[in-house]
Amino acid sequence: MDEGISKKFAIQLLEDDAERIKMLIRNQKNSLCISQCKAFEEVVDTQMYGFSRQVTYATRLGILTNDEGHRLLSDLERELNQLYTDVYEETQEKNEIGKEG
């Protein structure tokens, strides 16, 4: 059995975890909960915290460089911010259409 973890494998695992967090938000995209529900926000915050700890652990083990760890975190944060922005804009558009009708 191989006792080491390849860098490529570790990064893939972390990217898979990041994708799961993004899917959590995408699956709620059609719901008002994403923009108005504190419980959902706390779930996302908890997931992000857990992910950041995984990245820190991989960095401390020397599997990732600091730059790679920062990139993984900033990429996920940027994508999550975009998802939140998209949901906010869609909600605003629906509200405007509702006011016109």
UniProtKB/Swiss-Prot annotation:
It comes from Enterococcus faecalis (strain ATCC 700802 / V583). This is UPF0358 protein EF_2458. NCBIfam families: PRK13666.1. Pfam families: DUF1507. Gene3D superfamilies: SO2669-like. Belongs to the UPF0358 family. The lineage of its organism: Bacteria, Bacillati, Bacillota, Bacilli, Lactobacillales.
